[in-house]
Amino acid sequence: MSTTVIILAAGKGTRMRSQLPKVLQPLAGRPLLGHVIKTAKQLLAENIITIYGHGGDHVKKTFAQENIQWVEQAEQLGTGHAVQMTLPVLPKDGISLILYGDVPLVRQTTLEQLIEVSNKTGIGMITLHVDNPTGYGRIVRQDGKIQAIVEHKDATEAQRQIQEINTGIYCVSNAKLHEWLPKLSNENAQGEYYLTDIVAMAVADGLEIASIQPELAFEVEGVNDRLQLAALEREFQKQQAKELMQQGVTFADPARFDLRGTVKVGHDVRIDVNVIIEGDCELGDFVEIGAGCILKNTTIAAGTKVQAYSVFDGAVVGENTQIGPFARLRPGAKLANEVHIGNFVEVKNTTIGLGSKANHFTYLGDAEIGAESNIGAGTITCNYDGANKHKTTIGDAVFIGSNSSLVAPVTIGNGATVGAGSVITKDVAEQSLSFERAQQISKANYQRPQKLKK
């Protein structure tokens, strides 16, 4: 049976007090709506229909690369009205999941369970038991079966004591949506078209409404203001850290870790405090990440140790490598096994061979460095001429003295030595010594200028 996902994302988000549409507010490094779209794709939905309104152009531009049908809700007249807008493009057969752009963390497994129970009756929903149901629609049951959903403003005093609430997440056959949605009425306290009224229509048709509860309550929590956004962020990060610990990761403090993407981990990985992982990363066995590090789209092989406050973006790091503290690896950095990258060393678009070292205050950009070479403190590859980037090639077992400038394009042959303080503009032959510096001048008995006493 084909699955359509309908995402309601037209709200203004006034309480956010932001020029950014609410569904574009970031959570764990991804827009709220992006989380919902990701889940829809995990479900292999044939159709994803997103209803937009406030800031629609911005929203559509943000997700321009996604295969989405966009439907405008020019006037926000309720959730039922929003779903009515999809009828011209909604398939006649199959089922639809109705989700929300500001309820970002409902999980694939939960929705798969909802689909399964809904297939038996043609309609199902997610409900939740809460201690304080104020403001939420109540689930009214008779003999255990759902009879209606009553919005808080329309509820009687007795109904307001009910602690089972409507999350707004439904799975409904498309045939029934085409039948029920045109019948919705706005004769209620809010003057809106409630999607919840389809429950009463299902009961009137003699259908039993299936329901499930989420394993984790935060899955169905919505975001209306920045306080709720921050609270949901922390709940989500707590859950992600828990799942990583179950996979064998040791955290110095799981409350001080942020995962803003995905990470694959080996055995016995250790992560210190205030580490941020973004994009898609992979950490091998026995990898250690020091305090305050940021990793983005990076792979680090087994046994590597990263010291504090190092930043990685698009890097590939080999086994048993030592990095940091305060190192920066930029896109295209590829380090072989047993490499040493020390404090205040920046590596960009550079391959570094087995066992090579750059331990202090160095910039290596657009370079290829062989095995067992040593790059002295203060060395830079001068790769940019103001218009184009040029390559520096350094062979195996090369020794580059401190404070050297290698002006690309230039090649340093295997076994060569470059004297400290040199500006190398020509190729250096294998097993040779090259140095370039002005003659030292010394003046005896030199008197420095003195400040005049006031």
UniProtKB/Swiss-Prot annotation:
UDP-N-acetyl-alpha-D-glucosamine binds at residues 8-11, 22, 73, 78-79, 100-102, 137, 151, 166, 224, 330, 348, 363, 374. It catalyses: alpha-D-glucosamine 1-phosphate + acetyl-CoA = N-acetyl-alpha-D-glucosamine 1-phosphate + CoA + H(+); N-acetyl-alpha-D-glucosamine 1-phosphate + UTP + H(+) = UDP-N-acetyl-alpha-D-glucosamine + diphosphate. Its EC number is 2.7.7.23, 2.3.1.157. Residues 1-226 are annotated as: Pyrophosphorylase. Mg(2+) binds at D102, N224. One of its GO terms (molecular function) is glucosamine-1-phosphate N-acetyltransferase activity. The active site is at H360. The keyword Cell wall biogenesis/degradation applies. GO terms for biological process: cell morphogenesis; cell wall organization; lipid A biosynthetic process; peptidoglycan biosynthetic process; regulation of cell shape; UDP-N-acetylglucosamine biosynthetic process. In the N-terminal section; belongs to the N-acetylglucosamine-1-phosphate uridyltransferase family. Catalyzes the last two sequential reactions in the de novo biosynthetic pathway for UDP-N-acetylglucosamine (UDP-GlcNAc). The C-terminal domain catalyzes the transfer of acetyl group from acetyl coenzyme A to glucosamine-1-phosphate (GlcN-1-P) to produce N-acetylglucosamine-1-phosphate (GlcNAc-1-P), which is converted into UDP-GlcNAc by the transfer of uridine 5-monophosphate (from uridine 5-triphosphate), a reaction catalyzed by the N-terminal domain. This is Bifunctional protein GlmU. It comes from Acinetobacter baumannii (strain ACICU). The gene is glmU.
